[in-house]
């Protein structure tokens, strides 16, 4: 017996030492214990617990109330469940960095790009394009030329114009100039130039007045010049004209050399004339620019306070993964890829469920359906899929990087489930996968490369509605989510209570 004890003692001591070292090992980098400003570091490889499902909840930094509602509804139910509590891991996905540009000073509310207006040209008309003195007046063969632009601060276009040939005596052409709003087939206004009706000559252009509309911030338009004659237009490459942006209130949109032209361009990209515009609301613009320094100071202070609140929230609930991303709408696809990498490198799991913090989720119903339909194989994607979804070229969902008119099939973002091997593929390629305007369409484009088995299920609702048996439903306020869950707990149905 003593001999056996002598042999066993070193084993017992070794096991105890190994366990002690594990307990003292640091938490995963950028997981719940890490501060929101920490960099995403190498993840530890130790994976202590296996989970059937990892749930990733995309959440904005300031959505404290939505996260708390989730913690008090379906997450609380999950943690109190006798079996599911050990089978599911739920994490909120939050960008470690807030945007350092105040919302009022961004080009749009969806990105973190500074609206860089300096020394605006106020109370006078501005020629959008001008030619240098030594520009030659060669005649290209292009009969249709167009250029696109984006308005960054409200302007009014007063005139449309065309270039003329210096060798001509007077105006000897027939040209139509149209201005379109992006993705619209009908022109906002038209100017027609002909020898008997050529307008007014200003510098090297002929101009005609047009009906005046205020073009608002974020307006995207295209000007098209079309020759009605057999010979082409007098036009220039965009690099050979001077763009007068009024101090930064508009931007010409170019495809760039060697790139595919934008879908809404007609003919050849270039300039065959110009337009005259004025800047609107000049006093308001000056006030905005003068108040920027103080606004930035206040905003940075608020960011520090937000960091502290997030760190405290994370330490209390231990359910946040901070990913090394500036937290804006345009960066949501990058947030998701970072979370996939975190999941693979820190967690042992079978399936991953992605949802948003404004969504109702019934995890018990999800598990029941997995068992009923045997939804746990490899190369597997379970959701409610949109097919032939048109690509938007303007607005919040603007997509200029994906050239096709329609996206590949993609699952609605309110909830979908993917198998572990797909998560691993996404994680291993996260540094090379191009991100597009939304995480749902980005996922569809990425998945088109590997062709997973799609399981269509309409119970992952795409729109804000309530259906008995639904697995998810999006776009709810904190109060609405609370009410849905109250009905679910009281009556077994989040949509209604049957009269007894």
UniProtKB/Swiss-Prot annotation:
Post-translational modification: N-glycosylated.
Sugar-bearing residue positions: 116, 174
Catalysed reactions, as listed in the record: 3-O-(N-acetyl-beta-D-glucosaminyl-(1->4)-alpha-D-mannosyl)-L-threonyl-[protein] + UDP-N-acetyl-alpha-D-galactosamine = 3-O-[beta-D-GalNAc-(1->3)-beta-D-GlcNAc-(1->4)-alpha-D-Man]-L-Thr-[protein] + UDP + H(+)
Compartments where located: Golgi apparatus membrane; Endoplasmic reticulum
Lumenal side: 24-500
Ranges of the Cytoplasmic topological domain: 1-6
InterPro entries found in the cross-reference section: Glyco_trans_31
Pathway where this protein functions: Protein modification; protein glycosylation
Keywords, alphabetical: Congenital muscular dystrophy, Disease variant, Dystroglycanopathy, Endoplasmic reticulum, Glycoprotein, Glycosyltransferase, Golgi apparatus, Lissencephaly, Membrane, Signal-anchor, Transferase, Transmembrane, Transmembrane helix
GO CC aspect terms: endoplasmic reticulum; endoplasmic reticulum membrane; Golgi membrane
Protein's membrane topology: Single-pass type II membrane protein
GO molecular function, one term: UDP-glycosyltransferase activity
Record flagged with keyword Membrane: yes
PANTHER family per the UniProt record, alphabetical: BETA-1,3-N-ACETYLGLUCOSAMINYLTRANSFERASE (PTHR11214), UDP-GALNAC:BETA-1,3-N-ACETYLGALACTOSAMINYLTRANSFERASE 2 (PTHR11214:SF219)
Annotated disease: Muscular dystrophy-dystroglycanopathy congenital with brain and eye anomalies A11: An autosomal recessive disorder characterized by congenital muscular dystrophy associated with cobblestone lissencephaly and other brain anomalies, eye malformations, profound intellectual disability, and death usually in the first years of life. Included diseases are the more severe Walker-Warburg syndrome and the slightly less severe muscle-eye-brain disease.
Function, as annotated: Beta-1,3-N-acetylgalactosaminyltransferase that synthesizes a unique carbohydrate structure, GalNAc-beta-1-3GlcNAc, on N- and O-glycans. Has no galactose nor galactosaminyl transferase activity toward any acceptor substrate.
Entry protein name: UDP-GalNAc:beta-1,3-N-acetylgalactosaminyltransferase 2
Natural source organism: Homo sapiens
